[in-house]
Design a protein with these regions (language model features):
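Sequence/fold signature of self-assembling virion shell proteins
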Residues: 2-10, 143-182, 189-194, 200-302
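Assembly/oligomerization interface modules of large self-assembling protein complexes
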Residues: 25-83
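Solvent-exposed alpha-helices and their adjacent loops that cap or buttress functional pockets
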Residues: 79, 187-189
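N-terminal alpha-helical "arm" segments
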Residues: 1-27
């Protein structure tokens, strides 16, 4: 149904001072600080696990060389979705409004709505990171204690015992990252890159990462996390995280958390020939998810 003059009665008469409630300052883009962003020109994108070789065994004199083989494993698929919205407004509502460019203002609101959906869908990857109903290519949720290794065994990117964000829990997750292995169970030099938290943990994160001495103690010990430069002070607050206790550490694993832009923000405007109504629409096409779960470690909190 088209918006009409009855939708904006106060805009048809003198005496109105201001409009409020539609436009506020917005937080900077958050999803691109958590997900590595790529463009796409295909109907979907796929990443497939590839493995190398295990440790080379000792070869005895005159004996044949041992043989090994690499192989492909599971596949992660990114299926693009289209999000969009439209509105219509009558000619008369546009002509008789005394105070604002209604079409332009609501067109900005459309773009904001699409932006919100992008942020929410991206944040939901983390919101569902501990939920076994949402699995990746290896059949496990994003954060799990038993991700399968292709040649046998498992690895964990979740604290075995859920814990709130603290000095000890952060150190435990850094140790897990430091001892990470690939699918042939070979050590990999994985490094913490960014602490990702909900708004409720921003002050605790500042104390943990920026204090010169150990936070929350009377001892004269150094803050080992800061002194060693394990992660620096790079913190990303994700406004749309729904669990106030959950926290995450993004690593530098390649091909991990990914966002594919198939079609960037598109705006359209037309006029309905029969009614004269102005028609506005906006759309975006994208996908978001993960390939290698080693890109994220964390805990759901206690």
């Amino acid at each position: 149904m088209a918006m009409n003059r009855a939708s904006f009665p106060k805009d048809l008469e003198e005496g109105l001072n201001a409009h409020f409630g539609m436009e506020y300052r917005e937080y900077p883009e958050e999803y691109s600080k958590v997900f590595d962003t790529f463009s796409s020109d295909k109907a979907w994108e796929e990443d497939v696990l590839m493995t190398g070789f295990g440790p080379a065994p000792i070869k005895g004199e005159g004996e044949a060389f041992a043989e090994d083989e690499g192989r492909q494993g599971w596949t992660a698929r990114y299926n693009h979705v289209t999000v969009g919205m439209k509105f219509a407004i009558t000619q008369e509502a546009l002509e008789d409004n005394l105070y604002m460019q209604v079409g332009a203002r609501y067109a900005r609101a459309l773009a904001r709505s699409v932006k919100e959906t992008v942020e929410v869908m991206s944040a939901n990857i983390l919101n569902r990171a501990f939920n076994a109903s949402y699995t990746g290519g290896d059949g496990k949720e994003l954060l799990a204690t038993n991700h399968p290794l292709l040649f046998g065994g498992t690895f964990s990117n979740e604290l075995a015992t859920p814990a709130d964000l603290s000095e000890s829990s952060l150190e435990d997750i850094f140790i897990q990252i430091r001892t990470a292995v690939d699918d042939r169970n070979l050590p990999i030099a994985l490094k913490p890159k960014r602490l990702v938290i909900p708004p409720q943990l921003v002050y605790e994160a500042a104390r943990l990462l920026r204090s010169v001495q150990r936070p929350g103690t009377d001892y004269n010990d150094i803050n080992a996390i800061k002194a060693l430069g394990v992660i620096g002070e790079d913190v990303q607050v994700v406004t749309r995280l729904t669990d106030s206790d959950a926290w995450f550490v993004k690593t530098d694993a390649m091909d991990g958390l990914k966002f594919f832009d198939r079609v960037g923000l598109q705006r359209g405007m037309d006029e309905d020939f029969n009614t004269g109504n102005a028609l506005y629409k906006v759309r975006r096409r994208f996908s978001v998810g993960w390939s290698d779960p080693r890109a994220l470690y964390g805990s759901a909190g206690s």
